[in-house]
Amino acid sequence: MEVANGSSAAQGQNGSSEGSNGYKLKFCTVCASNNNRSMEAHLRLSQADYPVISFGTGSLVRLPGPTITQPNVYHFNKTSYDSMFKELESKDARLYKNNGILNMLNRNRGVKWGPERWQDWQVGVPRLQHAKDRGSEGTEGGLVDIVITCEERCWDAVVDDLMNRGSPLNRPVHVINVEIKDNHEEAAVGGQGILDLANSLNAAAREERDAVGASAFDNGSASSRATFDERVPDILASWQERWPNLPATWTVAWF
């Protein structure tokens, strides 16, 4: 059967194949406004019991308005998804229901409180105030293993920001861009693809963790994860064959 974008190949891959005791990599998903693409992926990964956090790289949160020149603008870290939902519902419920914004915000407010900005993230600082977020279990320490962005400019922003931070923790992190168009339909497909990639990466990480020992692997040092790091390009290449319409870019950066 022909698969146009990998969706058939990935159906049923919800993380359960790893088993309840399977090792789980920690993920971070990133888009521009932490509303559509990164939140779809955040939800998908959390439903598969992956530890996951999410961010946006924009200066402000921008959502479509009545015209292209009249976006709805909000501040990161200060505005909840619930307040956005209620404001837009009161402004024009019919418009924002028909364009999918209310449905998106309703989903988001069931995942976490509100959009967070990548550049404001204090890596390694405990995220105890996010205990109610979906996917929060395992991310309490403020560290992740894999960052997945959903647009090239977001990937650039993340990589540049990490370089500017100067690697204070000397801890490697894989930064992968999965190019996803910013609409609800493509975000849904992209979320499936990201979950498929997470499953493949996690399977390899579990094997390498078993080989080097849990304590050493979980320490996160470059030496203890070298064999896993070496496998990532091949894993990504195999995944790209399954998802040809989601172009990917990859690099190793440092926290």
From Swiss-Prot:
Q: What reaction gets catalysed by this protein?
A: O-phospho-L-seryl-[protein] + H2O = L-seryl-[protein] + phosphate; O-phospho-L-threonyl-[protein] + H2O = L-threonyl-[protein] + phosphate
Keyword Nucleus among record annotations = yes
User: Keywords assigned by UniProt?
Assistant: Hydrolase, mRNA processing, Nucleus, Protein phosphatase
Q: Where is this protein found?
A: Nucleus
Q: Which domain of life is it from?
A: Eukaryota
Any Pfam family from its record, for instance, is: Ssu72
- An example Gene Ontology molecular-function term: protein serine/threonine phosphatase activity
Which EC number(s) are documented for this chain? 3.1.3.16
What do the Gene Ontology cellular component annotations say?
nucleus
Entry-linked InterPro entries: RNA_pol_II_suA
Q: Give the principal location in a single coarse category.
A: nucleus
Query: What processes does the entry annotate via GO biological process terms?
Result: mRNA processing
Say if the entry is tagged with keyword Repeat. no
- Whom does it interact with, and what assembly results? Component of the cleavage and polyadenylation factor (CPF) complex.
Q: Function, please?
A: Component of the cleavage and polyadenylation factor (CPF) complex, which plays a key role in polyadenylation-dependent pre-mRNA 3'-end formation and cooperates with cleavage factors including the CFIA complex and NAB4/CFIB. SSU72 is required for 3'-end formation of snoRNAs.
Of which family is this protein a member? Belongs to the SSU72 phosphatase family.
In Swiss-Prot or TrEMBL terms, this protein is called: RNA polymerase II subunit A C-terminal domain phosphatase SSU72
Lineage at the top is:
Eukaryota, Fungi, Dikarya, Ascomycota, Pezizomycotina
What gene, per UniProt, encodes this protein?
A: SSU72
